[in-house]
Amino acid sequence: MALLSKEEQRQVAEAIDRVEQRTDAELVTVLAARADDYAYMPLIWAGLIGLLLPGTINYCLQWLSADELMLAQMSTFIVVALVCRVPKVTAFLVPVSVRRWRAGNLARRQFLEQNLHKTHDGTGILVFVSEAERYVEILVDHGIANRLHDDTWKAMVDVFTQQVRDGQILQGFLGCIHACGELLADHVPVTHGKNELPNRLVVLG
């Protein structure tokens, strides 16, 4: 199922159009289903539990021979790895710091991949969301950063993040785009009519 329908994506694109009529900023929005599949996490947890749990139990009780202990460790590894591959279990096992790091890394890659660093006056701005991580970030190029402090975007990010948690992704995008537009119209007002980047929502499945 799509994160946002075609109609909802059109609404986001139209909101970007309205903002860019009032500012030289080039606004790009990106919505990712997740920043990573975290396929390595089940193996890490299975390795730790498979190695330590049977060994610790056997150390205390001395029930198993060396061959039996190895078999118990292998069996534990397989069972834990299969259980941990369940998406909800995997999500629970991934530390918040890792989830945020992966989402932040993807946001920075998207800033480059969407050519936001190549605008003529350095006026690129990215509104990035990773749904699975409940992560929102606004990244700006130097032409905007020189006029608006990084802290300017924090309140918008906090509001949008809560909306993502509540499943209100479309409302979050529309509200954030509008709020960005109000600031950008004042600090990076329109001086030309050139549109350097496509006005659309980039969806990463």
Regions inferred by a protein language model and the residue ranges of each:
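Membrane-cytosol interface motif
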Residues: 96-114
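Acidic/polar active-site rim loop that often engages polyanionic ligands
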Residues: 82-93, 136-140, 156-158, 162
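Select subsegments of transmembrane alpha-helices in polytopic membrane proteins
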Residues: 38-49
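Short, charged cytosolic
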Residues: 3-27
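A membrane-cytosol interface segment of integral membrane proteins
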Residues: 4, 142-201
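Acidic, Ser/Thr-rich low-complexity segments on the non-lumenal side of membrane proteins
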Residues: 108-140
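Residue-level signature of catalytic and energy-coupling elements of molecular machines
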Residues: 24, 127, 176
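Transmembrane alpha-helices and immediately adjacent membrane-cytoplasm interface residues
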Residues: 58-93
